Amino acid sequence: MAVVTLSEMMEAGAHFGHQTRRWNPKMSRYIYCARNGVHIIDLVQTAICMNNAYKWTRSSARSGKRFLFVGTKKQASEVVALEATRCGASYVNQRWLGGMLTNWTTMKARIDRLKDLERMESSGAIAMRPKKEASVLRRELERLQKYLGGLKGMRRLPDVVVLVDQRRETNAVLEARKLDIPLVSMLDTNCDPDLCEVPIPCNDDAVRSVQLVLGRLADAINEGRHGTNDQRGADDSDD
C-alpha cells in the first residue's frame, strides 16, 4: 500500500513548485512540466520518494536512531512542533542558532540552563528573588524556551535531521553535512537534491503539504519504534 496517494498530494497542493526562473536544474528529474510560469512537480516521483523515505525513516527508528525536525518558517513552525512531539523527536521551529550542531557542547549548556530556570520557576525560587532579578531571569527563561524548548530531550547530537525548506535552513544543512548527519529533506523546485540523503520533492511552502509529509515521517518513526504509527509524545531522549 502506498504511503501517500496522488489524490492526497494533489489536495495538499504538493505539486506546486516555484516560478520557473527560480528553479534549480538539478531538480529537473522531479519536475513534470511548467504551467503559467510555475513548475509542476511530478507527483509520481514524489510518491516513489515518499515510499523510500518512509521505509528509510522507519528502519532508522527501528535501529534506535534519534531524530531532529527543523522548519522555522511560519507555514512549517507549528506542524514541526506537533509532529516532532508526536513521534518523540526533538525540533527547532523558531530560529536556527549558529552552532546548534557543530558547537553542541555550548548548546547543551544552554539547554541545561533552560532546565535549571524551569525548575526554579516551578519551585517558586524565581518568585522569591528581588523583583528586578526575577524579571531578568524570566526574560532569559522565555528566550531559551522559544529557541531551545524543542531540544530539551536531546542529550546528544541527532542521528538524522528532517528538514523543511532547504534554502531557508542553509545553516542547518551545512552543519549536518559537516558532521555527516544524514538529511531527510522536503525539496521544492529551487532546492539541490545533492545536499540530502533522502529527498522528497514537493511544495515546501503550503501548510497542508508540510503536514502531509511530516505526518507520514512521524508515522514511520512511531512504527519503527513501537510497531504502530499512533504513538504520541514518546521520548527519544537519553535521560
Swiss-Prot record:
InterPro entries listed in its UniProt record:
Ribosomal_uS2, Ribosomal_uS2_bac/mit/plastid, Ribosomal_uS2_CS, Ribosomal_uS2_flav_dom_sf
Keyword annotations for this protein, in alphabetical order, are: Ribonucleoprotein, Ribosomal protein
This protein's source sits in the domain of life called: Bacteria
One GO MF term attached to the UniProt entry: structural constituent of ribosome
Q: Which GO terms describe its biological process?
A: translation
Residue pairs linked by disulfide bridges in the UniProt entry: none
**Mind telling me which NCBIfam families this protein's record contains?**
rpsB_bact (TIGR01011)
Hey, which family's this protein in? Belongs to the universal ribosomal protein uS2 family.
Name of the protein this chain belongs to:
Small ribosomal subunit protein uS2
Q: Which gene encodes it?
A: rpsB
